[in-house]
Curated annotation (Swiss-Prot):
Function: Peptide with unknown function. Does not show antimicrobial and hemolytic activities.
Positions with biased composition (Basic and acidic residues): 1-13
Compartments (UniProt record): Secreted
Top-rank taxon: Eukaryota
Stretch list, region Disordered: 1-27
Keywords linked to the UniProt accession: Secreted
Lineage: Eukaryota, Metazoa, Cnidaria, Anthozoa, Hexacorallia
Protein name (Swiss-Prot/TrEMBL): Equinin A
Length: 27
């Protein structure tokens, strides 16, 4: 899902966690 405006910080944090977990973090 693409969020316009808010939620960017949360998405970045989520993607970072996925990368740390060795998962596929897109975006």
């Amino acid at each position: 899902a693409v969020d316009k405006g808010g939620g960017k910080a949360e998405k970045k944090d989520g993607n970072r966690k996925k990368k740390l977990a060795g998962g596929e973090g897109g975006g």
